[in-house]
């Protein structure tokens, strides 16, 4: 839907769109993509290329209880709030919101590359919450405890989390 070249899931699934793949898991396409990347970076090992990536602090997946009947309405409300915040030039923890991607919930991107995600679980009576900080583990926890958790706590339909950071 976004025209992304590649997509990756925590479960280990990966997807490549044209011109590399056909939109589904394909180990040979993944191997060819890695070999192509190494060919474009002569003299660098795969570990050298990995070290060049920025460090990110990503939370585990946190899932507050929310009934199947209520979860999509809750997510619609949260999407609307974040869209309004983004449209008004809003910020989260002092960082300007640069985008609110609303495919299957909302992923709010901040100016430093950090983000927060809220969506409905597709197969459980839960929401799915993930946060990522490009600054530190403490900042990752702050994105959850000072932004997402209080926003969801305003809704009586949202219950206890299965785990928290």
Place the predicted regions along the sequence by residue.
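Phosphate-binding and adjacent anionic-ligand microenvironments
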Residues: 1-165
